[in-house]
């Protein structure tokens, strides 16, 4: 029997590229270029976990770098197997997170899709993202011989309490003192207010972007959302 279906592709099946993707790639390229040339420009580089408070770094003009993002880039470039094998040769179990193994191996080999990350002047680890990051960052702090700050965030099993707020506030003050000590500069609280406002505005706008996916058909996919997530993680608090 003959089919009544047309051989022409359905317009609704066409993949429409998001125009802002190119601009994002350009901005991210500039971000990595600035990080790679930080030492020449007398700037400090901090490796920070994706859930860590980046705003104090931005306020102090410290360039934040995200090894987790780098792990994703290594995986997307099909280079993870070699770096993971290097980490395993160093004694790290193949059961560990592949992002961690990729980053540990890459730091030794100094390769990868962008030629390795710029060496850190400090490491900032916040355990609200996962438990692996604490040991991962301890390993890298020893390898690069740089100071490490760990921010411990309690798990809110029964809700947010004043005790939790005070506990985290105390650590944030310690975090600021740590940054002052490493950089030798006084912290600019007025600048932090500006950065905080931009960060909050960015988070609200990102929520609006995500909310449009409730529309049918959705204007962007889950893969698009992961791709554009780089902005709200990496450049939060900037404009």
Model-found features: residue ranges?
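Internal, well-ordered alpha/beta segment that forms a basic, Gly-enriched binding/recognition surface
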Residues: 106-108, 114-208, 212
């Amino acid at each position: 029997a003959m089919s009544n279906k047309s051989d022409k592709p359905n317009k609704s099946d066409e993949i429409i590229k998001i125009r802002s993707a190119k601009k994002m790639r350009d901005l991210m390229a500039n971000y990595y270029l600035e990080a790679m040339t930080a030492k020449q420009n007398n700037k400090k580089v901090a490796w920070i976990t994706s859930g860590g408070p980046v705003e104090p770094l931005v306020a102090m003009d410290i360039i934040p770098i995200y090894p987790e993002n780098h792990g994703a880039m290594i995986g997307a470039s099909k280079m993870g197997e070699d770096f993971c094998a290097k980490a395993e040769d160093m004694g790290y179990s193949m059961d560990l997170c592949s992002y961690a193994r990729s980053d540990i191996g890459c730091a030794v080999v100094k390769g990868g899709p962008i030629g390795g990350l710029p060496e850190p002047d400090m490491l900032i680890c916040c355990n609200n993202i996962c438990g692996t990051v604490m040991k991962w960052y301890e390993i890298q702090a020893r390898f690069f011989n740089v100071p490490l700050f760990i921010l411990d965030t309690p798990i809110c099993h029964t809700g947010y309490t004043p005790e939790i707020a005070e506990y985290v506030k105390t650590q944030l003050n310690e975090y600021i003192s740590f940054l002052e000590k490493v950089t030798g500069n006084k912290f600019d609280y007025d600048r932090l207010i500006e950065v905080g406002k931009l960060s909050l505005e960015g988070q609200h706008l990102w929520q609006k972007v995500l909310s449009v996916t409730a529309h049918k058909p959705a204007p962007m996919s889950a893969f698009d959302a992961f791709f554009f997530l780089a902005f709200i993680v990496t450049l939060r608090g900037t404009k």
